[in-house]
């Protein structure tokens, strides 16, 4: 971006509704990203987990990446994301000297990475570091220093002591800026003096590749944003005439 003469870059400049309106842009793209949930809501559990607020040391990947590691020697990582993040967090904690257990509802750790041919290497890296791996178990409850699971196959209960806990579940869009401009029901969009669009994880948390694609597409379509109710590609439509 720094090489482009028609692009101005302002890092460390958090904006709110007033500063966006004052800027005077013709088009505004909101790409404020997402944050990891800490309540246990995930693919396998469609509601927050009871007792999770009572755990003494419950962290998210955002906390870990900010340098906030559990002080406990034993840490449990619950991975209901199934991509690379759960494995990365477990490796980092193991490399920092923690005794790590990784539990996932999936059939194997980081199971989605079968699509990217990384699963075998991720599992080997975890085992080489002494990480305990438990698959096919879904989180059911959290206490102050332990976590309860149910086996996906037998429904048998399993309780694990977990002085430290890291939740790798779902991410929530950070869309407060967008809705402050568009209105809670997006009823104010037509009243704005500029075009408004949210893209990337701010719209729907996804992979890095998907976020890059979304930004690239939005830039290409900026001068003529398509109607969201119209499919922007040709479709095959079979027509059968009566005989």
PLM regions and their residue ranges:
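A Rossmann-like FAD-binding core segment of flavoenzymes
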Residues: 1-38, 60-63, 71-72, 95-185, ...
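Glycine-rich dinucleotide-binding loop and its adjacent helix/turn
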Residues: 3, 9, 17-18, 37-96, ...
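A conserved FAD-binding loop/helix module that cradles the flavin
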Residues: 78-92, 96, 108-114, 119, ...
């Amino acid at each position: 971006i720094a090489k482009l003469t028609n692009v101005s870059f302002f890092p460390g400049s958090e904006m709110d509704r007033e500063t966006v309106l004052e800027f005077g842009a013709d088009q505004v793209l909101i790409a404020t990203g997402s944050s990891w949930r800490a309540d246990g809501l995930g693919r396998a559990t469609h509601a927050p987990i009871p007792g999770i607020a009572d755990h003494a040391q419950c962290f998210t990947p955002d906390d870990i990446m900010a340098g906030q590691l559990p002080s406990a020697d034993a840490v449990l990582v619950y991975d209901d994301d199934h991509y690379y993040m759960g494995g990365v967090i477990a490796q980092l904690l193991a490399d920092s000297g923690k005794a790590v257990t990784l539990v996932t509802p999936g059939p194997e750790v980081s199971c989605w990475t079968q699509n990217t041919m990384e699963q075998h290497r991720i599992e080997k890296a975890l085992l080489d570091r002494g990480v305990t791996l438990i698959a096919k178990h879904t989180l059911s409850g959290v206490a102050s220093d332990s976590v309860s699971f149910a086996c996906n196959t037998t429904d048998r209960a399993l309780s694990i002591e977990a002085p430290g806990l890291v939740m790798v579940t779902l991410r929530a869009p950070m869309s407060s800026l967008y809705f402050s401009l568009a209105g809670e029901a997006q009823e104010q969009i037509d009243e704005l003096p500029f075009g408004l669009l949210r893209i990337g994880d701010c719209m729907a948390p996804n992979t890095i590749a998907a976020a890059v694609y979304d930004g690239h597409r939005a830039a290409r379509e900026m001068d003529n944003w398509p109607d969201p109710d119209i499919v922007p590609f040709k479709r095959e439509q079979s027509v059968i005439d009566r005989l």
